[in-house]
């Protein structure tokens, strides 16, 4: 990530617009997984993960997600993009997907803190 001073206002506003959509989606997804994971119902967990990916595809189709790559780690951004064309088929896939979501959540918080400073 560049230093917050190196962004112009338009970049920051565009990032905030896209990140707020993704952040809302991410918050909903992580809450949903908190509900289904404790039940250890693997088919339900996989179904929810694929539903989440489908919803993500809708959200990103409506926005310029590329702006996120200017703010978050490039490797994490690429993982995020890769998941959009993927289908979760087993628990290992889900664990990798969930790990990416947690990293994305952490990254968004770090960016917000840096932009606020």
Residue ranges and their predicted role:
Residues 1-117:
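Surface-exposed peri-terminal alpha-helical interaction modules
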């Amino acid at each position: 990530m560049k230093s917050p001073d190196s962004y112009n206002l338009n970049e920051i506003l565009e990032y905030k617009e896209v990140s707020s959509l993704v952040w809302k989606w991410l918050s909903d997804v992580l809450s949903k997984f908190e509900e289904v994971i404790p039940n250890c119902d693997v088919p339900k967990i996989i179904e929810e993960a694929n539903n989440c990916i489908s919803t993500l595809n809708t959200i990103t189709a409506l926005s310029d997600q590329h702006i996120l790559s200017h703010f978050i780690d490039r490797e994490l951004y690429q993982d995020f993009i890769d998941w959009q064309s993927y289908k979760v088929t087993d628990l290992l896939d889900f664990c990798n997907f969930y790990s990416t979501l947690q990293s994305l959540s952490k990254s968004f918080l770090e960016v917000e803190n840096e932009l606020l400073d």
